[in-house]
């Protein structure tokens, strides 16, 4: 059973304590009413993993845990089998005592693009919206964050996160809650808020930006990463039924348009930090994610387009400050 009591105890002692007015009731309702049909199977996989304290833990350059002496073949097989019960693994990679989880996305590449543009994370309290399996939460801790909180309603991601946490010695510096941003009150408590790979899934992108702003302290930093298209500040792509085979893509602005949106929501010091085309090396099918991936979503005769004829995915990172 995945419990959240440690997180409640943690925030009861800090500036997030007012979250306890709503959070426990929301989690209790989720536990009663909203659990996925496979959640018991997934949580059992987490429960059956061994409790290991790493001899060496690297969160600065990767998410890697090592033991002082190599694990036995039987121990490795047990860990490998249980982690494979949590497939598909989309965000990573992870290297855990010799079990290497080769995820669909090279999320470490994204982190390498984002990190140089951030304010120093040392001592910061961070919120990561739509955090997936929590890979970037661990990298935030590695970069010096005091506390990294992720929210993502996808319950498989919660179990993947808890599996990794258990294999990292039950590290309590990062936490994942099975919530969406719309379920959070205006906490105004986080020094840095990340929203990476979320905005284009929102029917009202400006509302999402306001929700992110409501989580930041004054002078806090927003890190926004999302799909963009080429164009000026008035360019926005509104796909039809699908974009790169995804049904839930609503608005893809140009980077200049996105900058304008942020300014309209009251953010200041907005800058476009990075724009890059997503490659089939960064997002691809692996033995830990065996279904279709980016290569299947691009026009086989023109890789600059999706199968629907839209511009192929490119992603921008924008940094902004709450005034």
Swiss-Prot record:
Coiled coil: none annotated. HAMAP family: tRNA_carboxymethyltr_CmoB (MF_01590). Homotetramer. This is tRNA U34 carboxymethyltransferase. Its EC number is 2.5.1.-. Catalyzes carboxymethyl transfer from carboxy-S-adenosyl-L-methionine (Cx-SAM) to 5-hydroxyuridine (ho5U) to form 5-carboxymethoxyuridine (cmo5U) at position 34 in tRNAs. It comes from the Bacteria. It catalyses: carboxy-S-adenosyl-L-methionine + 5-hydroxyuridine(34) in tRNA = 5-carboxymethoxyuridine(34) in tRNA + S-adenosyl-L-homocysteine + H(+). GO terms for biological process: tRNA wobble uridine modification.
């Amino acid at each position: 059973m995945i419990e959240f009591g440690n997180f409640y105890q943690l925030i009861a002692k800090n500036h997030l304590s007012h979250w306890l007015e709503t959070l426990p009731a929301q989690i209790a309702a989720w536990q009663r009413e909203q659990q996925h049909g496979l959640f018991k199977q997934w949580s059992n996989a987490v429960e059956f993993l061994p409790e290991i304290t790493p001899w060496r833990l690297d969160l600065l350059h990767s998410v890697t845990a090592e033991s002082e002496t190599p694990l036995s073949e039987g121990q490795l097989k047990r860990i490998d089998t249980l982690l494979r019960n949590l497939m598909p693994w989309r965000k990573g990679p992870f290297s855990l005592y010799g079990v290497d989880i080769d995820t669909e996305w090279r999320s470490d590449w994204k982190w390498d693009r984002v990190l140089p543009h951030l304010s120093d994370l040392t001592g910061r309290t961070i919120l990561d919206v739509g955090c997936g399996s929590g890979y970037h939460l661990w990298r935030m801790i590695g970069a010096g964050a005091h506390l990294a909180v992720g929210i993502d309603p996808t319950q498989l991601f919660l179990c993947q996160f808890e599996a990794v946490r258990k294999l990292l010695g039950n590290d309590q510096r990062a936490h994942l809650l099975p919530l969406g941003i719309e379920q959070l009150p205006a906490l105004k408590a986080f020094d840095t808020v990340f929203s990476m790979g979320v905005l284009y899934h929102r029917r009202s992108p400006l509302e999402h930006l306001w929700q992110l702003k409501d989580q930041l302290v004054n002078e806090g930093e927003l890190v926004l990463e999302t799909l963009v298209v080429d164009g000026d500040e008035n360019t926005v792509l509104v796909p039809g039924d699908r974009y790169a085979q995804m049904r839930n893509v609503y608005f893809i602005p140009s980077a200049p348009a996105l900058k304008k949106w942020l300014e309209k929501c009251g953010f200041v010091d907005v800058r476009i930090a990075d724009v890059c085309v997503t490659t089939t090396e960064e997002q691809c099918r692996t033995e830990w994610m065996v279904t279709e991936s980016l290569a299947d979503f691009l026009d086989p005769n023109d890789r600059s387009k999706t199968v629907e004829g839209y511009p192929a995915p490119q992603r921008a990172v924008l940094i902004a400050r709450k005034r």
